[in-house]
């Protein structure tokens, strides 16, 4: 079993902690955690980005993690970036409780997300269905509110 964690923070007030657990190399990754101080009752895009570099804030995290050079999509789409985790839903207090799994990301092997960044965005991810070029790259998810480097944990 491999476990990883990321502490999210940024220039906004948004902050949180997200944990990743994968039982074996071919098992889905379980994603749990809480992200706070976002807009109430909103969907916000969340993605794994290519670089584990936050030296220039969340901007230096680079593009969505996309080793197979696919278009942006929903977590359930066959055409999606590895890093496409879709939207998180906030409650009336602006907090999102995370408890879901993903079959594409991995904590094992050459395409592991460990050492890369997790980014929470300011807008709803259109899941690649926005009908423009930016939708196919980013889902029009907007500015980067908070980010952190995904690190191996115990």
UniProtKB/Swiss-Prot annotation:
PANTHER family: SUPEROXIDE DISMUTASE CU-ZN -RELATED. This is Superoxide dismutase [Cu-Zn]. It catalyses: 2 superoxide + 2 H(+) = H2O2 + O2. It is an enzyme of class 1 (oxidoreductase). PROSITE patterns: SOD_CU_ZN_1, SOD_CU_ZN_2. Its cofactor is Cu cation; Zn(2+). GO terms for molecular function: copper ion binding; superoxide dismutase activity. Induction: Repressed when copper levels are low in a CUF1-dependent manner (at protein level). Induced by high temperature. Belongs to the Cu-Zn superoxide dismutase family. The lineage of its organism: Eukaryota, Fungi, Dikarya, Basidiomycota, Agaricomycotina. It is a peripheral membrane protein. GO terms for cellular component: cytoplasm; mitochondrion; plasma membrane raft. Disruption phenotype: Decreases cellular superoxide dismutase activity. Sensitive to oxygen radicals. Decreases virulence in a mouse inhalation model of infection. Homodimer. It is found in: Cytoplasm; Mitochondrion; Cell membrane. InterPro entries: SOD-like_Cu/Zn_dom_sf (IPR036423), SOD_Cu/Zn_/chaperone (IPR024134), SOD_Cu/Zn_BS (IPR018152), SOD_Cu_Zn_dom (IPR001424). Zn(2+) binds at residues 64, 72, 81, 84. Substrate binds at residue 144. It comes from the Eukaryota. Binds 1 copper ion per subunit. Keywords: Antioxidant, Cell membrane, Copper, Cytoplasm, Disulfide bond, Membrane, Metal-binding, Mitochondrion, Oxidoreductase, Zinc. Disulfide bonds join 58-147. Destroys radicals which are normally produced within the cells and which are toxic to biological systems. Destroys radicals produced by host defense mechanisms.
């Amino acid at each position: 079993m491999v476990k990883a964690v990321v502490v999210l923070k940024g220039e906004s007030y948004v902050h949180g902690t997200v944990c990743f657990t994968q039982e074996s190399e071919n098992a889905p990754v379980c994603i749990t955690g809480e992200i706070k101080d976002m807009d109430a009752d909103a969907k916000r895009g969340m993605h794994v980005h290519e670089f584990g570099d936050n030296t220039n804030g969340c901007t230096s995290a680079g593009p969505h993690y996309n080793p197979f050079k696919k278009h942006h999509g929903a977590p359930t789409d066959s055409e999606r970036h590895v890093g496409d985790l879709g939207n998180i839903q906030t409650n009336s207090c602006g907090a999102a409780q995370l408890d879901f799994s993903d079959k594409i990301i991995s904590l094992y092997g050459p395409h592991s997300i460990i050492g890369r960044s997790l980014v929470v965005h300011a807008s709803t991810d259109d899941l690649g269905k926005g009908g423009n070029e930016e939708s196919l790259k980013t889902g029009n998810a907007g500015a980067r509110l908070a980010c952190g480097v995904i690190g191996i944990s115990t």
